[in-house]
């Protein structure tokens, strides 16, 4: 991320159809939303960021990637950290059929750093090497608890993204070796405290810890497939494509006469589905983490989606 003020942004236009297809509409929209008296501190910071990318961008990004690789190496090679933490590799997150390059990890203890350019050139999906996904379920804590109670409240480390059993560390061009060293030091402290607690734990407490770890790492709720849009919100063009009109469904939800409320805690929705009713979502349902919608307006609610929602132990 260039060192521009956060309120600033750039629109990158590099498309062969831009000039002939949308240039006039783009400028019309731009002039509608822009100000004739912009904040020149923001404008200046954007210009400095552009200059930085042009003159020293490659070097800064290279150091950023090296910092992320050094973090992976430090965690994977530390005997105590390996007991409770695991850096997720490419093979852990991308199925083999989508990795034509055959690369399983950007770094491993035997071969060191792998050439990630092959993955970027050949694979259908590739991971951002500057972001490190750390599995923390081995500590017995879910990602959100580990983020808030351990990293933020106790050690002052700010992160944004979590899942049921992972946290995501995002490096940037300002990441220093000392910040990486501090993070590793914190993880070692956490592992040492866990070791001490387990040494003093009773057999019953140990079993409870093992159950929590097993629940977080192995009993993951199956992610449901997208069901379908209700026929009332499908395109009637005869193409048979699965698209739906979310806008129509969203605003129809404001008509109370068209809506019915069901509790998630009981089996009333399953009973309605078994009786032949099609239940349709009126809004976006976005549990965080992970932060993506599992229901959108106009989508038919399936039993698999209901089971997934009940299995989630999220805060938002």
PLM regions: where:
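PLP-dependent class I/II
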Residues: 1, 25, 29-34, 49, ...
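Short glycine/serine- and small hydrophobic-enriched flexible loop segments
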Residues: 47-55
């Amino acid at each position: 991320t260039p060192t521009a003020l956060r309120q600033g942004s750039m629109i990158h236009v590099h498309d062969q159809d831009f000039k002939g297809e949308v240039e006039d509409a783009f400028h019309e929209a731009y002039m509608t939303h822009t100000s004739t008296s912009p904040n020149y501190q923001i404008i200046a910071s954007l210009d400095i960021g552009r200059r930085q990318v042009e003159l020293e961008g490659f070097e800064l990004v290279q150091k950023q990637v090296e910092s992320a690789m050094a973090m992976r190496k430090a965690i994977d090679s530390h005997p105590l950290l390996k007991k409770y933490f695991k850096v997720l590799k490419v093979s852990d997150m991308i199925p083999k059929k989508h990795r034509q390059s055959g690369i399983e990890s950007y770094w491993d203890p035997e071969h060191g750093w792998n050439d990630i350019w092959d993955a970027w050139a050949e694979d259908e999906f590739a991971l951002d090497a500057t972001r490190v996904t750390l599995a923390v379920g081995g500590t017995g804590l879910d990602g959100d608890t580990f983020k808030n109670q351990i990293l933020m409240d106790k050690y002052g480390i700010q992160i944004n993204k979590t899942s049921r059993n992972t946290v995501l560390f995002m490096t940037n061009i300002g990441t220093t070796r000392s910040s990486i060293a501090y993070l590793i030091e914190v993880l070692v402290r956490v592992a040492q405290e866990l070791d001490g607690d387990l040494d003093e734990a009773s057999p019953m407490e140990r079993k409870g810890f093992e159950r929590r770890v097993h629940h977080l790492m192995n009993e993951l709720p199956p992610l449901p497939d997208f069901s379908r849009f209700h026929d009332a919100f499908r395109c009637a063009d005869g193409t048979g494509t699965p698209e739906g009109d979310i806008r129509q469904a969203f605003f129809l939800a404001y008509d109370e006469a068209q809506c019915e409320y069901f509790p998630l805690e009981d089996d009333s929705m399953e009973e309605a589905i078994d009786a032949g009713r099609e239940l349709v979502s009126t809004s976006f349902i976005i549990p965080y983490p992970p932060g993506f919608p599992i229901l959108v307006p106009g989508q038919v609610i399936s039993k698999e989606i209901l089971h997934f929602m009940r299995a989630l132990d999220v805060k938002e």
